[in-house]
């Protein structure tokens, strides 16, 4: 459920833009995964979700993303097949090559912190940032960003804020399966603020809660109930 916890607000924002007639090209959300394997795994769920929202464009930009559309399409055909084994085409709203992403940046950009740093250095990728109308930055598995990796990512977040227009309108979302209990709230806020370079509120810490459906406990069954159940099973067996 972590993926849906940040994807649904992003989709909601984009749909509201569409209703208002302001949904133009430009990156609205950057989702940063620590590893390509995680991004590729989540892309399966995103493809299933975004097929219902063809107006929302999305794409993965990492070291495996091909430069040209022709190479990207050939690689897609080698990787993805339908039930009959035939190659499948990407959805019209999935951008699969660097050249198209540079010409027409997606609304939702999926990447990793290393590639994001390279993109900020390359003139070819300037359109991704100069035309961005960024509203969300998501750091998935945020607990990974500690030590040297955390310091590099923290600096990257500050450089990104300096690069985009209206940085104060960006909402940061950090996800982790190892948050800790309420007694760790202070450490969580301190970690998030140091990593992203912005202030966080305690009310912004959201933990998952397990809710089980209320069911009656049948600890003692009267013998008559077992006899009735047995007769039903015998009747069903005879009828078959």
Annotate the PLM regions.
Residues 4-21:
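Walker A/P-loop NTP-binding motif
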Residues 27-48:
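Conserved Walker A/P-loop ATP-binding site and its immediately adjacent core
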Residues 147-205:
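Post-DEXD/H (motif II) to motif III coupling segment of the RecA-like Helicase ATP-binding lobe
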Residues 235-240:
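Conserved small/polar residues in nucleotide/adenosyl-binding loops
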């Amino acid at each position: 459920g972590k993926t849906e916890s940040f994807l649904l607000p992003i989709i909601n924002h984009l749909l509201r833009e569409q209703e208002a007639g302001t949904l133009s090209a430009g990156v609205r959300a950057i989702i940063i995964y620590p590893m390509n394997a995680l991004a590729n795994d989540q892309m399966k769920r995103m493809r299933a979700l975004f097929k219902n929202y063809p107006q929302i464009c999305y794409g993965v930009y990492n070291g495996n993303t091909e430069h040209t559309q022709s190479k990207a399409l050939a690689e897609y055909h080698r990787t993805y097949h339908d039930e009959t084994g035939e190659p499948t085409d990407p959805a019209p709203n999935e951008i699969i090559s660097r050249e198209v992403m540079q010409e027409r940046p997606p609304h939702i950009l999926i990447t990793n912190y290393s590639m994001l740093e390279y993109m900020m250095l390359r003139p070819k990728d300037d359109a991704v940032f100069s035309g961005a109308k960024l509203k969300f930055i998501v750091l998935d598995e945020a607990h990974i960003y500690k030590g040297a990796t955390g310091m590099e990512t923290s600096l990257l977040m500050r450089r990104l804020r300096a690069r985009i227009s209206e940085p104060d309108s960006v909402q940061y979302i950090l996800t982790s399966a190892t948050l800790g209990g309420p007694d760790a709230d202070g450490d969580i806020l301190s970690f998030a603020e140091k990593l992203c370079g912005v202030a966080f509120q305690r009310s912004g810490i959201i933990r998952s809660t397990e809710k089980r459906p209320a069911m009656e406990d049948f600890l003692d069954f009267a013998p008559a109930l077992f006899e009735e159940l047995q007769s039903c099973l015998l009747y069903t067996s005879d009828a078959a």
